[in-house]
């Protein structure tokens, strides 16, 4: 039955083979889909695949066809509709098959195709497709009148497993009463192909001593007959093993996996086995076809054999004092594979090489052990050395032997050699007191002949004598003092180099260390010859003495002033002992600044003393590093010396004078224009005293207001000083009012903030501005010139007086000191923002106050 049509050309234009994955459906070349017989559509039959392939390019494509069950809806018959008629069934011959390699006779009848329309028409039958008009051509034909289908030759299934032909039924005049019919001819398989191994010869490796069941390898064979039939069901087996005994391998009949059947594989006995294997189809039955192949199994080596010495003992000889010389080669036997880690030997010296005179290495070419001398031997000390050497492989031992190291004994005979003198020990010492008289003789360096053990016949000479202090006797090695020996000059030890030689000219080198014993030949001295005493901050200085002699001739020291009892030194200075090596020098009277020479005698514990002329500088400074020495005249002529603080005081005085003159000039020009004060000049200093406030007042910061009095200008040019205020909180300048009836200007200090009073003109008035250009919170109280002069004059005078005092005290008094707590005081009143405002502008609101505030305003007005 015709189902539908698929457009195959859109998918694959060059398809040479078209067939369906489901035998219930047939596909024609034009894409028509037919059912081969009546089927019941179920969920399993909901889809099938059309397979398209090109046999030349081996290109394949698939088209998925989905089938939907459609129920026909019957309409109500109308009079004008035609009467429904039963459709006849399509012609559909049963599928047929042809045995592979059929012997005929040919042509061989297959089946008859016949159309039901032959009852009404004269039908001619024809076929087309592969095997008819396509390669392979002329394998099939059909009789035109009867529809009998014939095969003309035998067919190989492995080449053409099936043929899809299209049958046509037509009338003589060309009318086609039937749809084309797809006819599938299957080729029945015959067991005509023997299985073939993928390789003609296989090669595998397995380690010796492997356990039973160890996998060696797997073989594989293929069969071109029809899959999933008895013709392609294969069985594997081992036909023969060489060497035949013992049987060591087995093969799985289905998978072809070869495994070990014994653990007695020994590479040292047999390193390769050859197996003849067979594969047979028909599930291994005797009539099945079979093929054989060769499998070679190589036995891999493991370190199951220990290396063994060819001899158990060896004898070698070597001359004394020889180094880096080969004295013996030892060989080993090893059955493992040559030139592998299982065969290569590692030699070690197990015993007898405690002094490190020997080493043994492996010759990589011969695997022999090479014994060498790396440190000279001494015949006089040892004439024979017995060594015990061992050998192992590079790879770990995997055998069953308990001992893993093979050992041998080597006897090394040391041969005597005529040697030169021996300097032993190389460094020798002799102790001599320093300052011994020139010409003193003492023992010197000694070398000896190792053959005789004596120093007879050995000659000595110096090779190095840095100071030329000694001479060496060439026959005995005795040293003679040529110059005065000074222990302090050579740090207690003086080294000279000696060359000792015998009559044959053989030499040895040695060092003679002369240890100089100390004598008390040095008095203690004071290294620091100049002492600075800052008179303003200290009254003494500490001096320290040192003694280059050894401690036994050193401290404790005794310090004293050199001079008679009534000398000027004793009247001016005093020494006080601090510890064993230091004393404190202090002046007694109020000495002038200047430089003094004080002789100080220091005596060590044994009475050796030395006088040091100590230069003491009395300086006007804070630290000794700040001192710049100024000479002092000891006669009646005195010079006036100005310090830096005195110069600063002079400059400040000049600046103060300039400020006073500037203030007077400004006051004279602006006094006539001053407006009357709004508030009275009462005892409260123009502040409203509020007594009924129980809470703290508000902290307010206001914009810059005109300071109605005359301000002091900034620093005078050319003087180098500034008169200003320092910022304490947030960089703001404040003028605080004291409630006790005095108005003060307070200057505050905070690191890094300096401001100056600058003269500005604004509306004809002089104001106090911050040098930083920011707002300045000021008290707008009006000061008169007399009040300002009363306030500034005593303070400036006090600062000028303090400039010549000590720098430390001056710095402490030059700033407002901040205290954490000053005790509990009386309850403070609240001063609001309006009580501090002194502008004469913006007070018109007082004229419009209510009745409650008029009395208060009249009270505050200055009459």
UniProtKB/Swiss-Prot annotation:
Organism: Bos taurus (Bovine)
Glycosylation sites (chain numbering): 120, 346, 495, 579
Propeptide residues, chain positions: 1-89
GO biological process terms, semicolon-separated: cell-cell adhesion; homophilic cell adhesion via plasma membrane adhesion molecules
Source taxon at top rank: Eukaryota
Protein name, entry field: Desmocollin-2
Positions carrying Phosphoserine: 826, 830, 835
Single GO MF annotation: calcium ion binding
Domain notes: Calcium may be bound by the cadherin-like repeats. Three calcium ions are usually bound at the interface of each cadherin domain and rigidify the connections, imparting a strong curvature to the full-length ectodomain.
Lipid bilayer topology: Single-pass type I membrane protein
């Amino acid at each position: 039955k015709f189902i539908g049509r698929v457009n195959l050309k859109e998918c694959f234009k060059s398809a040479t083979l078209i067939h369906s994955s489901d035998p219930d459906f047939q596909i024609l070349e034009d894409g028509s889909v037919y059912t081969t017989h009546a089927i019941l559509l179920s969920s399993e039959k909901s889809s099938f695949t059309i397979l398209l392939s090109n046999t030349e390019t081996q290109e394949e494509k698939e088209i998925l066809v989905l089938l939907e069950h459609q129920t026909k809806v019957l309409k109500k018959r109308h009079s004008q509709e035609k009467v429904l008629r039963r459709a006849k069934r399509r012609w559909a011959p049963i599928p047929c098959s042809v045995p592979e390699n059929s012997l005929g006779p040919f042509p061989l009848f297959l089946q008859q195709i016949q159309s039901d329309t032959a009852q009404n028409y004269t039908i001619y039958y024809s076929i087309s497709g592969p095997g008819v008009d396509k390669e392979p051509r002329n394998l099939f034909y059909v009789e035109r009148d009867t529809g009998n289908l014939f095969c003309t030759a035998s067919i190989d299934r492995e080449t053409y497993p099936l043929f899809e032909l299209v049958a046509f039924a037509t009338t003589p005049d060309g009318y086609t009463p039937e749809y084309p019919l797809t006819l599938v001819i299957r080729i029945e398989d015959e067991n005509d192909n023997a299985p073939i191994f993928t390789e003609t010869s296989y090669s595998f490796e397995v380690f010796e001593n492997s356990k039973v069941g160890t996998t060696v390898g797997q073989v594989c064979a293929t069969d071109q007959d029809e899959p999933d039939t008895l013709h392609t069901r294969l069985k594997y087996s081992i036909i023969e093993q060489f060497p035949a005994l013992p049987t060591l391998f087995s093969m799985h009949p289905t998978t072809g996996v070869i495994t070990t059947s014994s653990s007695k594989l020994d590479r040292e006995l047999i390193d390769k086995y050859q197996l003849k294997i067979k594969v047979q189809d028909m599930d291994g039955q005797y009539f099945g076809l079979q093929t054989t192949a060769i499998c070679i199994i190589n036995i891999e080596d493991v370190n199951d054999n220990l290396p063994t010495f060819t001899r158990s003992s060896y004898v070698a000889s070597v001359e004394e004092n020889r180094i880096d010389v080969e004295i013996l080669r030892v060989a080993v036997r090893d059955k493992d594979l040559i030139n592998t880690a299982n065969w290569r030997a590692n030699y070690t010296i197990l015993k007898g090489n405690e002094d490190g005179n020997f080493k043994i290495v492996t010759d990589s070419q011969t695997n022999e052990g090479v014994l060498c001398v790396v440190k000279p031997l001494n015949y006089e000390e040892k004439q024979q050395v017995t060594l015990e050497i061992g050998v192992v492989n590079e790879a770990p031992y995997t055998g069953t032997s308990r001992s893993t190291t093979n050992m041998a004994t080597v006897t090394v005979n040391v041969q005597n050699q005529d040697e030169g003198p021996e300097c032993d020990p190389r460094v020798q010492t002799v102790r001599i007191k320093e300052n011994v008289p020139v010409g003193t003789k003492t023992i010197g360096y000694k070398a000896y002949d190792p053959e005789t053990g004596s120093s007879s016949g050995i000659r000595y000479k110096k090779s190095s004598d840095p100071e030329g202090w000694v001479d060496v006797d060439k026959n005995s090695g005795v040293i003679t003092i040529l110059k005065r020996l000074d222990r302090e000059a050579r740090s207690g030890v003086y080294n000279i180099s000696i060359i000792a030689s015998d009559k044959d000219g053989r030499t040895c080198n040695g060092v003679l260390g002369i240890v100089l014993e100390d004598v008390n030949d040095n008095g203690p001295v004071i290294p620091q010859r100049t002492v600075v005493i800052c008179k303003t901050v200290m009254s003494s200085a500490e001096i320290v003495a040192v003694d280059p002699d050894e401690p036994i001739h050193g401290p404790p020291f005794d310090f004293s002033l050199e001079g008679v009892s009534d000398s000027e030194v004793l009247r001016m200075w005093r020494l006080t002992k601090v510890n064993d090596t230091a004393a404190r020098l202090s002046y007694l009277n109020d000495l002038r600044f200047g430089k003094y020479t004080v002789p100080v005698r220091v005596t060590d514990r044994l009475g050796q003393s030395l006088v040091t002329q100590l230069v003491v500088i009395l300086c006007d400074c804070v630290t000794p590093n700040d001192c710049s020495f100024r000479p002092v005249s000891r006669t009646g002529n005195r010079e006036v010396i100005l310090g830096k603080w005195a110069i600063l005081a002079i400059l400040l005085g000049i600046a103060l004078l300039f400020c006073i003159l500037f203030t007077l000039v400004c006051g004279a020009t602006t006094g006539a224009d001053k407006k009357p004060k709004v508030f009275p000049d009462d005892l409260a200093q123009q502040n409203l005293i509020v007594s009924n406030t129980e809470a703290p007042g508000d902290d307010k910061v206001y914009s810059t207001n005109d300071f109605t009095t005359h301000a002091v200008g900034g620093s005078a040019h050319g003087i180098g000083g500034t008169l200003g205020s320092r910022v304490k909180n947030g960089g703001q300048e404040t003028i605080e009012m004291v409630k006790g009836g005095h108005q003060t200007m307070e200057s505050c200090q905070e690191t890094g903030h300096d401001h100056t009073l600058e003269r500005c003109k604004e509306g004809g008035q002089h104001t106090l501005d911050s040098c930083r250009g920011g707002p300045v919170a000021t008290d707008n109280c009006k000061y008169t010139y007399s009040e300002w002069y009363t306030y500034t004059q005593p303070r400036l005078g006090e600062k000028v007086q303090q400039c010549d005092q000590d720098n430390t005290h001056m710095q402490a008094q030059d700033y407002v000191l901040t205290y954490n707590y000053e005790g509990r005081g009386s309850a403070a009143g609240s001063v609001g923002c309006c009580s501090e405002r002194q502008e004469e502008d913006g007070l018109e609101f007082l004229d419009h106050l209510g009745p409650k505030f008029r009395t208060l305003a009249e009270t505050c007005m200055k009459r």
